[in-house]
């Protein structure tokens, strides 16, 4: 059992960059989601940490799995939902600050239900980190 179990929705981020010379909007791809960020930070600090979530069977889901494995986050409790995408969001910037637009309705993580949660893993975790 992991010392720290992080449960929440990872989302692929597209963060707006300054316009290019031709005026087009450009976006930098990244990984977002409070629980994913916390899991990575804990793993980098030497903690035994696992993610509990669902990802789509898509490039974004594969990207998160690769990131967590590279960072030392246990992915044994990460489900793949072949019928739903991994959530994404966009960050845009203007004179009033930055603004978020989420596209997560029907995402793999949003479809998790109580019956999908492994009770033994939840009971065995020293810390359960949630976001929502």
Which residues does each predicted region cover?
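Glycine-rich phosphate/adenosyl-contacting loop at the front of the ribokinase-like
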Residues: 1-73, 112-114
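Conserved N-terminal subdomain of the carbohydrate kinase-like
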Residues: 48-132
């Amino acid at each position: 059992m992991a010392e720290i179990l992080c449960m929440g929705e990872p989302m692929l981020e597209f963060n707006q960059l300054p316009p290019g010379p031709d005026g087009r909007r450009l976006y930098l791809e990244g990984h977002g989601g409070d629980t994913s960020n916390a899991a990575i930070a804990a793993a980098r600090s030497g903690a035994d940490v696992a993610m509990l979530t669902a990802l789509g069977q898509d490039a974004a889901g594969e990207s998160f799995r690769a990131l967590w494995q590279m960072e030392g986050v246990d992915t044994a409790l990460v489900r793949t939902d072949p019928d739903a995408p991994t959530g994404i969001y966009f960050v845009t910037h203007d004179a009033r600050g930055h603004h978020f637009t989420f596209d997560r309705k029907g995402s793999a993580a949003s479809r998790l239900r109580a019956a999908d949660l492994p009770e033994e893993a939840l009971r065995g975790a020293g810390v359960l980190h949630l976001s929502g």
